Amino acid sequence: MAPTERPWPWRMIVRGGFQDAWSQAPQAEKNEVFAAWIAAQRGWVELGCRLISTLDDELNMVGQPRGRLWNFYSLWEIPDPGIVYDLLNPFRTEAEGVIRLDRYFSIETVVGKPINSLERALLAPPASS
């Protein structure tokens, strides 16, 4: 059976929370971890994903999340839901000389499709008069 053609892209929300290792790390270590975090997500782009937007909840929270589990978010367009395991695997992989990112961040994803009618209604350019 051939895959179903979809007139819309898959979307993925990434929810992240800081772990103790991040909160307690000296700035030099945080800089290394942040560079590794960016590199991991650059790998997502190489797999066909596109970053749409990000949000850091630092206005309402300092340190690790307590009432909520998450304090930073990103929204991605992804080629297929089946890719999510491959996207998250670098965060939990143990390798010599590679920073294990799940020590510093907890990550969860939500995958779905856009609400096309809402996007068409609100993102369409205004009609000229």
What are the functions of these language-model segments?
Residues 1-70, 78-84, 110-129:
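Short S/T/G/P-rich N-terminal loop/turn motif that feeds into the first structured element of a domain
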Residues 74:
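Conserved, mostly hydrophobic/aromatic
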Residues 103-111:
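A short, structured active-site edge motif that brings together acidic residues
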Residues 91-102:
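A common structural junction motif
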